[in-house]
């Protein structure tokens, strides 16, 4: 008998022996005897069962890996160092994190010099051959835009449950870490299948379209302390917002939660915690029957510096079975998260949460997508699970657990549909009144913000009457809405207009603001002047700028017509450099402001208005909102004229002249721009940050460092556009490290790019550029036949007439007509 036949025979014998032993344990021994055997000798039992599954593992190895493969190379001495340290420190939740050097190879073979450690507090993460890892990448060489990743065994996250939970989170509009499944090799040996997620970082925030100048909190270690009683129980993953050093935002949230008055709590909680996000976060947990984001762990709170509020981010949601009767338990446990409990104890808040829950449950396609995703994930990953021989469970256990968790997810949906879709849900339960006030050793004193980051917080919820008592230069109409003007009005200090009203600024009003004084409104502003009686915002100081005119989270659209904004008496000199930032107002309720006019989480319409001499980063800044700008002029601003982040809108018949930096700087934004003139910009005519879509029609860019900059994965369509006098006409490049390369796309049609001092167009390998029926002076390799290399002549460029004097290639190239914009 050959050696090969002997090995095959031995393998078959081992399988038969293991199978016989399994059958003996399962069918011969009664349950009271069988269970202790399995529990006490789980490792042996699993090993025997795994022997019977050798054919499945061998079959899986014949197939390509269905997931990315990572390779980690670590010196055995360093691995022993980690083993010894974690074994000695097991159970010590306050242990230091130690890292050792290693080399990481991505699926494409790229090498990264990294630092690694074991991840996790319990011994299950480092006592067995399949360990959990945290891998930290160098700042100058991020991995897929990530600073750090964690690899844990999938059983720790209920196999496919957490991936499904994060899939749901994205459908609900919640931020979430990027996750996935990977196969790991350590020092050339298989380490098995892992669940990967990125670590909490600025990069994670940016990937979720959240500003990195906020704060990101999580619990400090894994203890038994109530997170919602002290700021000392929280750590900061990101600490960039005003007051971060003393956790002023968190102190305010905890103080409001623990205030004895329900009226005070209900009035103020939505001004420090974004309740719309809270409802989505809570519904997300309910769908999994989860109580895992409780008072002691798994809390992730992001303070949004554009909104001045916290937002929950789901984390380690887990799964639970909603099988208790609705009358005795309901879906809102009374003892797991005090902030959840107190919010939902207020009937109007509870009804809003229930409305969102019903919307999700009533959408059959949305519900079906959850299970379709779960099932497809199982089918994709099953071969990788079968291949993994280091896992501490059998293939049968994996299949049964996946089926069991799916059944729980299904029962939870059915339970919620029965009680919250087909029946009237129960009313809110009363909050536990003794919790906020009593401590074993005496009266509880909640934390108090110690700095000035939230000086104006209680102004947000003022009534119009309370506001007028503090600001008698305003008035109120019979509808309860506020008015300012006409005539001259002086604001010597920052004034905050409360929510739930509207501010009307009358035609013919001159608002003089003292140095660094701001007007911040949590309600829509209606400022409609006329050509004869404009509204003007002017500096009171002859040398210093005023602060900002800001609109924050207003539910209705604000309108500005025939409004003149002058930030300083003369243009700030010198202009800001492209990488320099200048704060002109704040902190105001945890927010800083760099725009002369700032619109956040709101809609604005601007017509026939002028923005001049802005001293900060932007003349007009729109973040997480919408804009419609027509017939307006931006001139002599120190940095960017218009800046939009994660917004959408239109710009029509508008001029941007003599900007220190960019004419238009848009990031994560979708914009339609037509009949616009951008002249003499210090940096870019149009700057397109990541994930931006620009449609530019019949517009002119004259004299800029870069005419149109298209970064990362953005796209631009230029039709009947003109770019002259730039160092580079169109520049496509990689800018943001969270994107692996520049994959931008640009289409240029019926346009003219000429008089570039360095190069006409710069395009990297991974980007795409299509051109037709255009004049490209100097030409461009690979262009279509109707792309002409000539030097164009204009009718009167000095006077702003950029129409072609002659039309090589036909009348359809260049401007269709002369844009009529303010001079």
Description of each model-found segment:
Residues 128-163, 251-275:
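Short, conserved helix/loop micro-motifs enriched in His/Cys and acidic residues
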Residues 148, 174-185, 265-269, 299, ...:
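Surface-exposed patches in mature extracellular/periplasmic domains of secreted proteins
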Residues 442-507, 512-823:
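Extracellular beta-rich repeat passengers
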Residues 255-294, 301, 308-453:
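Middle-to-C-terminal accessory/interaction subdomains
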Residues 154-187:
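A conserved helix-loop-beta module that forms one wall/lid of the active-site cleft
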Residues 98-155, 561:
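Conserved oxyanion/phosphate-binding beta-strand-loop segments in alpha/beta enzyme cores
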Residues 174-177, 189-282, 378:
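Internal "kinase-insert"/substrate-recognition segments embedded within catalytic cores
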Residues 2-111, 365-469:
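Regulatory N- and C-terminal appendages and interdomain linkers associated
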């Amino acid at each position: 008998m050959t050696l090969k036949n002997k090995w095959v025979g031995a393998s078959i014998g081992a399988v038969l022996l293991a199978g016989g032993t399994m059958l003996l344990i399962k069918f011969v021994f009664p349950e009271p005897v069988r269970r202790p055997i399995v529990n006490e000798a789980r490792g042996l039992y699993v090993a025997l069962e795994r022997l019977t599954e050798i054919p499945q593992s061998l079959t899986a190895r014949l197939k390509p890996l269905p997931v990315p493969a990572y390779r980690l190379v670590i010196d055995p001495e360093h691995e022993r160092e980690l083993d010894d340290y974690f074994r000695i420190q097991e159970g010590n939740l306050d242990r230091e994190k130690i890292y050792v050097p290693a080399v990481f190879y991505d699926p494409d073979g790229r090498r990264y010099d990294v630092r690694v450690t074991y991840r996790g507090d319990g011994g299950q993460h480092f006592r067995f051959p399949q360990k959990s890892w945290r891998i930290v990448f160098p700042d100058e060489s991020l991995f897929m835009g990530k600073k750090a990743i964690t690899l844990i065994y999938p059983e720790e996250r209920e196999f496919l449950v957490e991936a499904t939970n994060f899939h749901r989170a994205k459908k609900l509009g919640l931020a979430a870490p990027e996750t996935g499944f990977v196969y790991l090799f350590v020092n050339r040996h298989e380490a098995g299948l892992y669940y990967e997620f990125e670590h909490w970082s600025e990069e994670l925030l940016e990937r979720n379209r959240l500003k990195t100048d906020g704060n990101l909190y999580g619990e400090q270690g894994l203890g038994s302390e109530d997170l919602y009683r002290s700021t000392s129980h929280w750590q900061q993953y990101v600490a960039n917002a005003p007051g971060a050093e003393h956790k002023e935002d968190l102190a305010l949230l905890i103080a409001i939660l623990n205030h004895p008055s329900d009226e005070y709590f209900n009035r103020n909680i939505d001004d420090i915690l974004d309740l719309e996000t809270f409802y989505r976060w809570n519904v997300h947990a309910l769908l999994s029957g989860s109580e895992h984001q409780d008072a002691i762990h798994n809390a992730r709170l992001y303070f949004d510096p554009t909104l001045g509020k916290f937002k929950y981010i789901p984390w380690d949601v887990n799964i639970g079975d909603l099988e208790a009767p609705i009358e005795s338990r309901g879906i809102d446990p009374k003892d797991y998260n005090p902030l959840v409990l107190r919010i939902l104890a207020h009937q109007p808040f509870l009804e809003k949460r229930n409305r969102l829950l019903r919307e999700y449950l009533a959408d059959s396609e949305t519900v079906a997508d959850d299970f379709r995703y779960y099932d497809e994930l199982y089918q994709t990953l099953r071969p990788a699970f079968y291949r993994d021989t280091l896992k501490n469970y059998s293939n049968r256990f994996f299949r049964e657990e996946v089926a069991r968790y799916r059944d729980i997810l299904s029962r939870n949906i059915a339970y919620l549909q029965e009680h919250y879709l087909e029946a009237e849900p129960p009313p809110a339960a009363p909050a536990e009144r003794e919790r906020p006030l009593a401590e074993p050793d005496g009266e509880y004193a909640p934390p108090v913000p110690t700095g000035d980051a939230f000086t104006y917080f209680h102004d947000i919820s003022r009534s119009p009457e309370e506001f007028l008592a503090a600001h008698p230069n305003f008035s109120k109409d019979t509808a309860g809405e506020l008015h300012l003007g006409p005539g001259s009005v002086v604001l010597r200090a920052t004034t905050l207009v409360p929510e739930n009203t509207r501010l009307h600024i009358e035609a013919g009003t001159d608002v003089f603001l003292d140095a660094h004084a701001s007007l911040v409104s949590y309600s829509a502003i209606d400022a409609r002047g006329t050509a004869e009686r404009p509204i003007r915002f002017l500096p009171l100081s002859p040398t210093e700028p005023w602060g900002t005119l800001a609109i924050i989270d207003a539910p209705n659209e604000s309108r500005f017509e025939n409004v003149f904004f002058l930030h300083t008496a003369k243009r700030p000199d010198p202009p800001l450099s492209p990488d320099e930032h200048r704060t002109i107002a704040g902190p105001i309720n945890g927010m800083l402001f760099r725009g002369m006019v700032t619109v956040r989480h709101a809609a604005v319409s601007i017509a026939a208005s002028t923005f001049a001499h802005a001293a900060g980063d932007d003349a007009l800044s729109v973040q997480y909102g919408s804009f419609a700008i027509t017939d307006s002029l931006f001139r002599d601003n120190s940095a960017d004229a218009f800046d939009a982040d994660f917004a959408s809108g239109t710009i029509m018949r508008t001029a941007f002249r003599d900007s220190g930096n960019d004419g238009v700087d848009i990031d994560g934004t979708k914009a339609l721009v037509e009949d616009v003139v951008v002249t003499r910009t210090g940096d870019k005519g149009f700057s397109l940050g990541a994930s931006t879509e620009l449609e530019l029609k019949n517009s002119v860019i004259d004299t800029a460092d870069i005419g149109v900059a298209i970064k990362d994965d953005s796209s631009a369509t230029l039709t009947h556009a003109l770019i002259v006098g730039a160092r580079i006409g169109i520049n496509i490049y990689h800018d943001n490290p969270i994107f692996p390369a520049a994959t931008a796309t640009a289409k240029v049609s019926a346009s003219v790019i000429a008089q570039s001092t360095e190069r006409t167009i710069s395009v990297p390998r991974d980007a795409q550029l299509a051109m037709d029926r255009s004049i490209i002076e100097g030409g461009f390799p690979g262009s279509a036949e109707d792309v002409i290399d000539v030097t164009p002549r204009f009718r009167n460029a000095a006077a702003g007439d950029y129409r072609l004097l002659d039309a090589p290639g036909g009348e359809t190239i260049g401007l269709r007509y002369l844009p009529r914009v303010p001079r």
